[in-house]
């Protein structure tokens, strides 16, 4: 499969593989254009993840400065989002609305350095459209602004006073072409609120959905991007670090049941094989 990628793409995968395992690159490849490697990383929004792996390498100073600056920006943004996540979730809970953190800081918790996983917005899962509309009203009273044009069928968007997007998800993903799959996902969504676990990320504790359901959401998110929204390697990085952590046999069985019943087992196998081939 390696012939499908050029040497710079392969080198990016090698560095990411080391970074995701908290290992350092000891030797650079003299045949690789590292400016191009970083440009590819930038296009996939994973430059900051490379920082620990390259910290002791002999990367040219101008290229290293790009990585260093991007890492600094990402850490700052990560803490801004962390505080916003906590504020929004607590505000909604105080008003009787349960919200589950999707992706973002919750996913970052699995990385060796959580602060280096780049994210640009806040994603929350709510129980239904009625609660989502209520949440929008509550947030508007706190200075948040609802987007005038709502382009998605599965979430509503508002903006914080400091211009960070909040996506309030009314469903796990955009509807697929299969009515059977869509009905299954609608029923499955209810379980996200009854199967929970606490996760501490960057010093803040959140109530996330249980691992089996969380993995299934990551897969659905990948499938959505694969079919409709453009696919980046950061999605694969999330998949790698999730399964690299300790997941109980019971949660693995839950995940397997969900992918079998939803008809997404083949896609899960394909994504996992790609990760094994290119990200170790």
Task: Enumerate the predicted regions with their spans.
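Conserved NTP-donor binding/palm subdomain of two-metal-ion nucleotidyltransferases/polymerases, i.e.
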Residues: 1-120, 126-280
């Amino acid at each position: 499969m390696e012939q499908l990628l050029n040497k710079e793409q392969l080198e990016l995968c090698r560095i990411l593989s080391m970074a995701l395992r908290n290992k350092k690159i000891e030797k650079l490849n003299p045949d690789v254009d590292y400016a191009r490697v970083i440009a590819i990383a930038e296009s996939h929004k994973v430059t900051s993840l490379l920082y620990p792996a390259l910290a002791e390498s002999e990367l040219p100073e101008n290229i290293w400065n790009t990585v260093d600056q991007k890492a600094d920006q990402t850490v700052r943004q990560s803490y801004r989002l962390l505080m916003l996540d906590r504020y929004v979730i607590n505000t909604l809970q105080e008003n009787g609305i349960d919200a589950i953190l999707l992706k973002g800081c919750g996913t970052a918790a699995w990385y060796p350095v959580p602060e280096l996983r780049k994210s640009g917005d806040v994603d929350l899962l709510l129980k239904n459209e009625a609660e989502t509309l209520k949440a929008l009203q509550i947030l508007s009273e706190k200075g948040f602004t609802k987007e005038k044009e709502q382009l998605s069928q599965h979430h509503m968007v508002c903006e914080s006073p400091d211009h960070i997007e909040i996506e309030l998800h009314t469903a796990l993903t955009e509807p697929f072409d299969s009515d059977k799959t869509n009905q299954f996902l609608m029923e499955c969504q209810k379980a996200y609120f009854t199967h929970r676990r606490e996760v501490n990320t960057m010093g803040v504790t959140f109530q996330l959905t249980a691992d089996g359901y969380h993995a299934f959401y990551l897969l659905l998110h990948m499938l959505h991007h694969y079919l409709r929204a453009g696919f980046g390697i950061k999605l694969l990085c999330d998949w790698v670090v999730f399964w690299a952590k300790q997941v109980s046999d019971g949660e693995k069985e839950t995940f397997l049941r969900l992918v079998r019943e939803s008809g997404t087992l083949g896609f899960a196998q394909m994504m996992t094989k790609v990760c094994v081939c290119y990200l170790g």
